[in-house]
């Protein structure tokens, strides 16, 4: 029996959540920003409610992709450094995911979208319906298509509408 698998690009979603909620910056009593944490889980829970997946996997980048930089030296050259207020929130997001028993996949030198692309391809070949939750507009062009047509992309934008 086929399953519905929700794959989440953790870095993309945390970034999207952070910038979408900057106008209402939330902090703990000790001064740690939590708006990306709040937004990330708001997006995730809304998607779970809408899609009712059988399995959820979240992938994170833990370093830059040397492979992509070797292919294209200007890869991510124009991007700004990740704000410290956002960087401090990644461990919190990961810890909460672990507490919910949601698998986290990350590998040094391999970006989250490449990890999820490989998982999508493998699970798609099994006939599973794959939903990739990402805010990365280039995702479709950089992700290898699975063997089946059961691949769907969702953006986080609707989670912050209203």
Model-derived features with residue positions:
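Noncatalytic, basic helical substrate-engagement surface that gates or grips nucleic-acid strands
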Residues: 2-133, 139-143
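Serine-biased, low-complexity intrinsically disordered segments, primarily in secretory-pathway proteins
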Residues: 145-162
């Amino acid at each position: 029996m086929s399953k519905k698998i929700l794959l989440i690009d953790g870095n993309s979603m945390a970034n999207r959540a952070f910038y979408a909620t900057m106008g209402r910056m939330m902090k703990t009593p000790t001064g740690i920003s939590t708006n990306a944490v709040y937004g990330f889980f708001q997006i995730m829970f809304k998607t779970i409610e809408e899609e009712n997946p059988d399995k959820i996997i979240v992938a994170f980048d833990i370093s830059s992709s040397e492979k992509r930089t070797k292919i294209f030296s200007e890869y991510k050259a124009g991007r700004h450094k990740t704000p410290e207020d956002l960087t401090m929130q990644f461990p919190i997001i990961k810890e909460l995911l672990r507490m919910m028993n949601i698998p986290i996949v990350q590998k040094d030198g391999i970006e989250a979208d490449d990890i999820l692309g490989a998982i999508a391809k493998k699970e798609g070949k099994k006939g599973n319906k794959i939903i990739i939750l990402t805010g990365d507009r280039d995702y479709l062009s950089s992700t290898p298509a699975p063997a089946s047509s059961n691949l769907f992309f969702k953006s986080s934008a609707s989670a912050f509408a209203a």
